[in-house]
């Protein structure tokens, strides 16, 4: 670990653009750290204010403490030149020069962010959770900000699916904000996802850092789904960043009388894509609408089901058999269609026929 590179973003008044320039001309964090004042001004193009801030920070910073924090919290970092740096984020207007992370960074470009209001309604929570779950089951990574309300619902929904989910924090990764989501964040990491931040370890969650955080949420994804947002919601800042980066904006329509839907309904009026189902996202990007099924014992079947097969599968149980007649009533399918789909489910090994003629999920 280059502790110098990992420590430099903690210096006040050195923004992303400045640090990117420093790394491009000095090549390593150690060379930046040990550069003379003249070199920092001439090659690094630091202003007098930035120079004084860096010299003070360099003198007072406890590198050993930062190193121990990163070790204790299993915090890694990458720079723009590293292979693991998220590709979509790297190609934005203002990418973080150093990205800290806990867990595993996503390697796919099938990434969608879901954002929304903290004081979400039951409708908003249910919608966020369901869309995230269905997308995750179809190998789409869900990114959000880890806040209360819509963000948390999106992460929880994604955890019920197959793909990873990513939280973008507005503080150092040794901090937990909000504290109530500590267990959720640990589940995200355990599920193969990660928590990322552009802020050095030790940085508290300050208000001004949340809008800056939102550009990462927008930048590392193909599109942003806004689910419930007031007229001046932070989620609309994320949508603005998405527009700047040429990302797609999707909005879920809401109650026209509710304050919590004024922002999303406004987005729809000015041209955002209307999103009423996970299928709207899959259709927009031409992503295959198939998923892996997890049974109640959490055994994953590597069998791809069509939508009709999936509907039928959901009416089956692991422990209680269901008859053909019962399935006809519950699904409303024709007998010919039902028999054909049952045969396909049996051939794929996810459903078996019992000696009495009923059907159960294979164990």
Please describe what each predicted stretch is:
Residues 1-83, 251, 324, 348-350, ...:
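Short, small/acidic-rich helices and loops at N termini and domain boundaries
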């Amino acid at each position: 670990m280059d502790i110098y590179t990992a420590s430099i973003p903690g210096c006040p008044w050195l923004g992303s653009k400045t640090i990117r320039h420093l790394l491009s001309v000095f090549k390593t964090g150690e060379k930046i750290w040990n550069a003379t004042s003249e070199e920092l001004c001439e090659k690094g193009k630091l202003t007098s204010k930035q120079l004084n801030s860096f010299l003070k920070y360099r003198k007072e910073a406890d590198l050993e403490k930062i190193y121990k924090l990163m070790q204790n919290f299993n915090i890694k970092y990458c720079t723009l030149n590293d292979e693991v740096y998220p590709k979509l984020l790297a190609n934005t207007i203002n990418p973080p020069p150093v990205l800290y992370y806990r867990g595993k960074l996503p390697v796919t470009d099938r990434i969608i962010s879901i954002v929304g209001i903290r004081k979400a309604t039951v409708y908003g929570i249910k919608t966020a959770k369901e869309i995230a779950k269905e997308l995750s089951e179809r190998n789409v990574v869900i990114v959000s900000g880890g806040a209360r309300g819509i963000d948390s619902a999106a992460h929880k929904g994604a955890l019920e699916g197959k793909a990873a989910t990513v939280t973008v924090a507005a503080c150092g990764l040794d901090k937990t904000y909000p504290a109530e989501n500590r267990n959720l964040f640990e589940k995200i990491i355990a599920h193969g996802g990660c928590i990322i931040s552009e802020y050095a370890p030790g940085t508290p969650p300050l208000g001004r850092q949340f809008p800056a955080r939102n550009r990462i949420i927008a930048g590392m994804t193909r599109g942003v789904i806004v689910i419930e947002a007031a007229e001046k919601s932070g989620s609309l800042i994320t949508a603005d960043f998405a527009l700047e980066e040429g990302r797609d904006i999707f909005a879920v329509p809401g109650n026209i009388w509710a304050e919590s839907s004024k922002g999303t309904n406004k987005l729809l009026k000015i041209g955002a894509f209307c999103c009423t189902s996970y299928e709207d996202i899959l259709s927009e990007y031409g992503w295959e609408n198939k998923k892996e099924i997890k049974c109640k014992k959490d055994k994953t079947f590597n069998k791809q089901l069509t939508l009709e097969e999936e509907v039928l599968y959901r009416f089956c149980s692991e422990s209680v058999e269901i008859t053909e007649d019962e399935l006809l009533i519950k699904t409303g399918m024709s007998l010919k269609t039902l028999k054909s789909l049952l045969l396909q489910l049996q051939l794929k090994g996810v459903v078996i026929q019992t000696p009495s003629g009923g059907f159960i999920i294979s164990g």
